[in-house]
C-alpha cells in the first residue's frame, strides 16, 4: 500500500466516510488519482466505494494491527513515553494486542528482571528482538490483530497475576468515564487481566476520545491511570 493510500485509510478509520473532493483537497492530488486509489483499496478490502466517496469496510470494525501500528505514530510515542513512568525493575507485565501498547517495548527493554505476558504474536516477536523474556498465552489465532483469543486464551489469563497491565481499546468517553471496544473477544481477555492486575494503565490517542463502542470494558475509576494524548494523567 502506498503512503497516500495509508493516509486515506487513516482518514477513513477516523471519520468512517470520506468524499473524493475532500480527499483531493487534503492530499493535494487530483480527484482522478483519489478515485484510482479508492478503487485499489476497495479491491484490497479496505473500503467500499459509493458515488463521490467511500466508507470504511467493516473488518470486525477496525483495520489490521499491521496497518494501525504506523498510524498516529507521534501520538503513540507520546503515550508510550508517559506510560513508561509506571515501569520498574522486576515487574510482571501484560501488554494487550493493541498497536499503541507495542510502542512500550523499547522502554520495557531498559528494565531488569521484567517478565512480559501478552496475547499478541506481534508483541512476542518484537519482544524477542529486544531480548525481553515473554510468555504468549494460548488460544485461537485472530489474524487481523495477530493475537490469541477465545476460551483457551481466557483460561490462560484467568490464572495470571500481573503487577501492571497496559491496555488500549477503541473508545474512551471522557464525560462518562466508560472505556469500551467493538470486539467482544478482546474485551473478555482484557476484563480478566484487569481483574487480576495490581495496577492498570490505559492509553488513548486523540481520535478515540468522546466515543463509545458496544462492549464496555470498565470505567475510568477501575484503572490506575488513563492517559490521553495531549492531556495529563487522569
What would you call each of these model-derived segments?
Residues 2-21, 25-26, 32-97, 105-113, ...:
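HTH-adjacent hinge/linker in prokaryotic transcriptional regulators
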Residues 72, 93, 116, 146, ...:
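Glycine- and other small-residue-rich loops at beta-strand/loop junctions that grip anionic moieties
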Residues 98-99, 170:
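Active-site metal-binding loops of divalent metal-dependent hydrolases
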Amino acid at each position: 500500500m502506498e503512503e497516500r493510500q495509508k493516509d486515506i485509510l487513516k482518514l477513513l478509520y477516523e471519520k468512517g466516510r470520506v468524499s473524493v473532493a475532500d480527499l483531493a483537497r487534503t492530499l493535494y492530488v487530483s480527484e482522478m488519482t483519489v478515485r484510482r486509489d479508492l478503487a485499489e483499496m476497495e479491491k484490497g478490502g479496505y473500503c467500499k466505494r459509493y458515488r463521490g466517496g467511500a466508507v470504511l469496510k467493516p473488518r470486525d470494525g477496525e483495520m489490521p494491527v499491521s496497518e494501525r501500528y504506523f498510524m498516529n505514530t507521534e501520538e503513540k510515542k507520546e503515550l508510550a513515553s508517559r506510560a513508561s513512568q509506571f515501569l520498574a525493575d522486576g515487574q510482571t507485565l501484560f501488554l494487550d494486542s493493541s498497536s499503541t501498547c507495542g510502542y512500550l517495548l523499547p522502554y520495557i527493554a531498559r528494565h531488569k528482571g521484567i517478565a512480559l505476558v501478552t496475547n499478541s504474536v506481534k508483541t512476542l516477536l518484537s519482544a524477542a528482538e529486544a531480548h525481553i523474556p515473554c510468555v504468549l498465552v494460548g488460544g485461537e489465532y485472530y489474524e487481523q490483530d495477530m493475537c490469541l483469543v477465545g476460551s483457551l486464551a481466557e483460561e490462560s489469563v484467568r490464572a495470571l497475576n500481573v503487577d501492571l497491565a497496559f491496555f488500549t481499546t477503541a473508545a474512551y468517553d471522557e464525560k462518562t468515564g466508560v472505556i469500551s471496544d467493538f470486539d467482544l473477544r478482546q474485551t473478555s481477555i482484557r476484563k480478566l487481566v484487569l481483574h487480576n492486575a495490581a495496577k492498570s494503565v490505559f492509553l488513548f490517542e486523540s481520535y478515540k476520545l468522546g466515543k463509545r463502542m458496544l462492549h464496555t470494558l470498565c470505567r475510568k475509576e477501575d484503572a490506575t491511570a488513563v492517559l490521553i494524548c495531549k492531556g495529563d494523567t487522569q
